[in-house]
Regions:
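Extended alpha-helical targeting/anchoring segments
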Residues: 1-397, 404, 520
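Helix-start/capping segments and mature chain N-termini
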Residues: 240, 277, 376-380, 384-602
């Protein structure tokens, strides 16, 4: 639970937006007042009031909904708000941030928390929206549209604890927690956005539109290849350049002549679940430009509309059934003196209470250009939701080892794999604690054969469980999954953790069956739920390639090094011509298998 102290109404943890600009890590308690704009006509006066208060020495923290765009241009078409009792924009005004123990307490949430996700886009509707966008692009209506679809769920636990989990899952972001209702109807917002909307200080305005995405790789080599693909892919570069041109045009409306520049183009950056591409656009605002003028020129950010902006927003309204809310709007802080930093609230959750339940909404989107495909955009949507999957439920790192007659087999390889998972998920290094824990297990079980479950938590602490292991039968009966494993390329497949619901769903119901053979959405075999798979085809033992989506098993790596296995892409239909099938892992070794249920399709 959070430590005792005043419950924060706002938390801001913004990375440094530019060289020489300090990062922000601020907690705020009760506001001295909260400014709210309920309709578009009230938004510009609200921003003028925020600007004046900040220049007089106040801290102002707040947000604008995407639907506040009508305040700046009547041609910006968006849905009406879903609830007229909640503001389009709101800013809390503070004398200063919390300090000392109160600040520490505000950031101290650590309770277990979970989000139960129950709804997302339907594939048919998603494909239909992409098709409509591509038709509009082909007809010359526009060049690019940022299409979004929400993920819906319910929160079990405390919102501050969820925000802490989100920050662990998406570190080094422009993160914000806002609870500005102060007794009036309002949602709570939890943002861990990687995208800077703008930073304005000392006569310089910096915008950093983010467009272009690639998934993180299955291993270091694949990860480097994904980064290089993103840097050089024509679709991703075109997507980014269109928005850079849009932002240059937007900034020119308030900039001194010839001051708009692009000092950095097509910069790629690694985030926990994806690679992202961004570019920098800078300008010197003309004298007399105020905060409302900056929003008037830039809002909503072109990266989350498309180009041209007016036409893109009209199409967005047609294909998206509901208002976006704060998602794709702006969240930020205006400091005493007027320096302002705002994010684009992607990777952002909106929480709404109905008395008994806290409903969670998370928008996820991508830029659609002429060469987009529905399948590719669907994959991108899934990759982008991975950050919230990681934060939605606590988990531990897991290794399963064979302890036989006082010796842990391939212990070093297992510990190395656990260390790699810790680096990926941002856990404290578990190596020392894991080694001590294994030594204690060995001392307690010097005889016999044991299955050891070694677990490590986020703090790097380790624990272990040991169970007697019966000999494996010489031949096991297995089945083939009736449906594909959705998201076989996800991080909870590539790394071994206690998050195994995606495997448990395929566990055989028949106790006579040993395991289930899985396959991905392309019809490629991947692995069993508890081990790797090998097929003998044309006299050669083959195992699925990592890019098909599977755990890089310790035994698998050894057999590949020894030349006893070769990697390949193996399809379901290859089972019919295989003259050998095996289950294997470092716990049970090599076990011959026989498929008793034929796959459907493929």
């Amino acid at each position: 639970m959070a430590a005792a102290g005043p419950r924060p109404t706002a938390l801001i943890s913004f990375r440094s937006p530019d060289e020489g600009v300090p990062a922000l890590h601020l907690a705020f308690g009760a506001a001295r007042q909260t400014l709210r704009a309920m309709v578009p006509a009230e938004v510009v006066p609200l921003l003028a009031r925020v600007d004046a208060l900040a220049r007089a020495g106040a801290w102002c923290v707040g947000y604008l909904h995407y639907e506040a765009s009508a305040a700046f241009d009547a041609a910006f078409d968006a849905h009406a708000p879903s609830d007229a009792t909640r503001p389009l924009a709101a800013f809390a005004v503070y004398d200063g941030p919390l300090a000392g123990a109160d600040a520490d307490a505000a950031w101290g949430a650590s309770a277990d928390v979970a989000v139960e996700w129950s709804g997302g886009p339907k594939r048919e509707a998603f494909n239909g929206a992409i098709a409509e966008i591509l038709r509009a692009i082909a007809d010359g209506e526009l060049y690019q549209v940022n299409a979004t679809a929400p993920l819906l769920g319910t929160l079990r636990g405390d919102a501050l604890a969820l925000f802490a989990a989100l920050r662990r899952a998406q570190p080094n972001a422009y993160a914000a927690y806002l609870d500005l209702g102060q007794g009036l109807p309002d949602d709570r917002f939890l943002s861990v956005s990687p995208e800077l909307f703008f930073d304005w200080r000392d006569g310089r305005l910096l915008a950093r539109p983010m467009k272009g995405t690639a998934p993180r790789g299955a291993d270091a080599a694949d990860d480097a290849a994904q980064a290089e693909f993103l840097r050089s892919a024509p679709k991703e570069r075109a997507e980014n350049l269109m928005i850079v041109d849009l932002l240059r045009n937007d900034l020119s409306r308030i900039a001194e002549p010839h001051s708009v520049q692009v000092p950095r183009l097509f910069h790629t950056e690694a985030w926990p679940t994806v690679w992202q591409m961004s570019s920098d656009v800078v300008a010197r605002p003309r004298p007399g430009i105020a905060l409302a003028d900056v929003f008037g020129a830039l809002f909503p950010c072109g990266s989350i509309t498309g180009a041209p902006k007016v036409q893109a927003m009209r199409l967005i309204k047609r294909i998206e059934a509901e208002p976006r809310g704060v998602y794709c709007g702006a969240i930020g802080v205006v400091q005493p003196g007027g320096a302002a930093t705002f994010n684009v609230p992607i990777r952002t959750l909106a929480l709404r209470d109905d008395g008994a339940t806290t409903h969670v909404r998370c928008g996820i989107g991508s830029g659609i250009t002429a060469d987009a495909t529905a399948a590719g955009e669907w994959d991108e949507w899934r990759h982008k939701r991975a950050f919230v999957d990681r934060a939605s439920q606590a988990f531990e790192l897991l290794e399963t080892l064979r302890l036989e007659q006082g010796v842990v087999e391939e212990a070093a390889a297992h510990l190395e794999r656990m260390a790699g998972a810790a680096r990926h998920f941002g856990f404290a290094p578990p190596a020392a604690a894991a080694a001590r824990t294994l030594a204690a297990v060995v001392a307690a079980h010097p005889r016999g054969t044991w299955r050891v479950r070694l677990l490590a938590d986020r703090a790097g602490d380790a624990r272990a469980e040991a169970f007697e292991l019966a000999p494996s039968p010489p031949l096991v009966r297995v089945q083939v999954a009736r449906t594909p494993l959705i998201g076989a390329d996800g991080e909870f497949v590539r790394f071994k953790t206690t998050r195994r619901a995606h495997y448990d769903a395929f566990a055989p119901r028949d106790p006579e069956l040993f395991d289930t053979l899985l396959w991905n959405e392309r019809g490629e075999l991947t692995e069993f739920t508890r081990g790797n798979v090998a097929l003998r085809l044309d006299g050669q033992w083959l195992t699925p390639a990592l890019r098909c989506g599977l755990l890089p098993g310790v035994a698998r790596a050894r057999l590949l090094r020894e030349g006893r296995l070769r990697e390949a892409v193996i399809h379901k239909h290859d089972l019919a011509r295989a003259d050998g099938l095996a289950f294997f892992n470092s716990l049970r070794g090599w076990v011959d298998a026989r498929c008793v249920l034929a796959p459907r399709g493929g």
